[in-house]
Amino acid sequence: MLEKYLEISKEVSEALKENKPVVALESTIISHGMPYPKNAETALNVEKIIRDKGAIPATIAILNGKLKVGLTKDEIEYLGKKGKEVVKTSRRDIPFILAKKLDGATTVASTMIVANLAGIKVFGTGGIGGVHRGAQESFDISADLQELANTNVAVVCAGAKSILDIGLTLEYLETQGVPVVGFGTEELPAFYTRKSGFKVDYRVDTAKELAEALKAKWDLGLKGGMVVGNPIPEEYQMDYDTITKAINDAVKEAEEKGIKGKESTPFLLAKVKDITKGKSLEANIQLVYNNVAVASDLAIELSKLNK
């Protein structure tokens, strides 16, 4: 049944059969996260980092109505060039993108779904979605959070994107029973900065310790993922006050223009990039590189435990 929809590359398929470490990657970061050719270059560098670490990258996207797990260089270039013409696809969109045989860029939520269908348990990305500022009125809450509650995939990220309400995001995750872990930190990172002012549930200092906690969670049938907050490397983090002001200005502009829903995150990130004269984009790229390195280590440790 699944073969009709799911196409796993030979390399990824063989790695999974042999219990080799595999790291899932999303494609919204390629189509909506940055301009071409930077987006394709970054995606290929990310794959190289994972390979150098000793794991196998599995970039996930929907191409011509097929859920693809593991993309070729040409497919990554294609997504990079098409950019925002590709539909940003979350859980609710998958059935229609498949039925209409369209191209779709997977978000954190839909990447988790497809990774789980393929049997991949670790996913490295930039930041997760969350509760938007003002959600008390708008109810704008990313589907990523519900996915983390339901789907058994660990997500290594630099925290929640700082354009969000981090406090409310953590409250939501707590209600859903999703552990929020700091990798080498007591505090949840805030994407562009190492600190957010919010404590994590647990601090973990090694990938081995993380893998053991995940194995225990899933062995007990406690469904859902885990948020692994991995701070941006110090030399690339942005000045807290500068980035906070840039975000506040961007949020204000989005409100004035009535930008909401799935359009809001790409708009806010692009605005912050303009305000910071491109510095936020460089920070974004570096934090992704850092996250996939940790995700690779975690995938390696998990595969050892599952031998």
From Swiss-Prot:
Binds 1 Mn(2+) ion per subunit. Substrate binds at K88, V108, S142, A143, D144. Keywords: Glycosidase, Hydrolase, Lyase, Manganese, Metal-binding. Transmembrane segments: none annotated. GO terms for cellular component: cytoplasm. It holds the Pfam family Indigoidine_A. Its EC number is 4.2.1.70. The active site is at E26, K161. Its cofactor is Mn(2+). It comes from the Bacteria. Belongs to the pseudouridine-5'-phosphate glycosidase family. Homotrimer. This is Pseudouridine-5'-phosphate glycosidase. It comes from Clostridium botulinum (strain Langeland / NCTC 10281 / Type F). The gene is psuG.
